[in-house]
Amino acid sequence: MSKGRVTQLMGPVVDVRFEDAELPAVNNALVVRSDSGEELTLEVALHLGDNSVRTIAMSSTDGFKRGAEVENLGRPISVPVGDVTLGRVFNVLGEKIDLDEPLEEGVRRDPIHREAPDFENLSTETEILETGIKVVDLLAPYIKGGKIGLFGGAGVGKTVLIQELINNIAQEHGGISVFAGVGERTREGNDLYYEMSDSGVIAKTAMVFGQMNEPPGARMRVALTGLTMAEYFRDEQGQDVLLFVDNIFRFTQAGSEVSALLGRMPSAVGYQPTLATEMGQLQERITSTDKGSVTSIQAIYVPADDYTDPAPATTFAHLDATTNLDRKLSEQGIYPAVDPLESTSRALDPEVVGKEHYEVATEVQQTLQKYRELQDIIAILGMDELSDEDKLVVARARRIQFFLSQNFHVAEQFTGQPGSYVPVQETVKGFKEILEGKYDDLPEDAFRLVGRIEEVVEKAKGME
């Protein structure tokens, strides 16, 4: 393969000149070796003219210098795929980072850059994916083979929610899961690995990490590494795969970090001008085909709780369901802090979820909306000034709001309370009975952090 030399190092961006050799194609992988024998993988981003290319480093450039020899591998970064990846932990390059044995030679590797599936191969069936989380299943149900976004600011519970979904869905689903940790805390990845090992889910899960401490190149490409592994299970084995990504915002953030160094003019709020294109290329590959499905659940950080920020706003367009986490709810101790009025799903349709479910969900939202409108009056004049009808709306809305909370299995070590998994039918039944006024005489606190409606009745007896 052709060889070149490093002419410039600017943090994660490296310029390479190929004197007489053919220039490597954009997205091709290059390898540099330092004097101490360390290897650094680069990915070609731009052709600069003058036989030079500008590349993005996939690991730290410390210890490398100008003049170092660079080898063109003649292909994009390629990562291992197939059953050998299950139960293992990899980095962006598909190198193992767990303590198990190295992978055997000759394992199939696929390039991380691929085209999205053709239109005629896409599947359009709509089937509900039960999560066991009441607020999600009732008001913003997830679609099998769909794309789901968990939106929230810092510290409102995105990662805990995604871990609960892994716990509930991966165990119930029994199929294959891929987890991509993109620019998040290493500690959380470590905790997740051991939790999955303890529960046995790890045997059917491939994990890929490019965490906060890694250079932007790794954080920008690690989502594609995880996606490539998921695509193999979908296309070659016809599996229904779960793809968890935590956090998709860090993918955008990493692109923004290298964008200026690559010489691109910044766009709105300093983001890269190619933001929508990069997001589209990633999201269009996460889809269901006539061979199998990829259901993706993506945590999306919302900077300063501003949903109009270009990064979360660009992601919205690609999703089938959104679960919006609200800081005000977490401050009230309502967990999961999912906003029941802002969260959306295209599956909340009588044709998909059934007439009863749809009517109960709509009535719950109407009751909560009425309560939200009355809150200003309550704050200024107090409850006594409300009509009897409005007082009843407020009482039921508060019970609904508390009943939308529940304990999580993954938070048991913090709360000391066992987690609860609530089937959809039980969820619909519980809210229907609250709306009918069956539990108007029970204290509000009995509805807080419980699973089924029967638990509310038991809790209320203990409070007497």
Curated annotation (Swiss-Prot):
GO CC aspect terms: plasma membrane; proton-transporting ATP synthase complex
GO molecular function terms listed in the Swiss-Prot or TrEMBL record: ATP binding; ATP hydrolysis activity; proton-transporting ATP synthase activity, rotational mechanism
Classification via PROSITE patterns: ATPASE_ALPHA_BETA
Membrane topology, from the record: Peripheral membrane protein
Record has Lipoprotein as a keyword: no
SUPFAM superfamilies per the UniProt record, alphabetical: C-terminal domain of alpha and beta subunits of F1 ATP synthase, N-terminal domain of alpha and beta subunits of F1 ATP synthase, P-loop containing nucleoside triphosphate hydrolases
Subcellular location: Cell membrane
Entry binding sites for ATP: 152-159
Coiled coil: none
Any Pfam family the entry gives: ATP-synt_ab_N
Keywords recorded for this protein, A-Z: ATP synthesis, ATP-binding, Cell membrane, CF(1), Hydrogen ion transport, Ion transport, Membrane, Nucleotide-binding, Translocase, Transport
Catalytic activity annotation: ATP + H2O + 4 H(+)(in) = ADP + phosphate + 5 H(+)(out)
Sequence similarity: Belongs to the ATPase alpha/beta chains family.
Function: Produces ATP from ADP in the presence of a proton gradient across the membrane. The catalytic sites are hosted primarily by the beta subunits.
Subunit structure: F-type ATPases have 2 components, CF(1) - the catalytic core - and CF(0) - the membrane proton channel. CF(1) has five subunits: alpha(3), beta(3), gamma(1), delta(1), epsilon(1). CF(0) has three main subunits: a(1), b(2) and c(9-12). The alpha and beta chains form an alternating ring which encloses part of the gamma chain. CF(1) is attached to CF(0) by a central stalk formed by the gamma and epsilon chains, while a peripheral stalk is formed by the delta and b chains.
Protein name in the entry: ATP synthase subunit beta
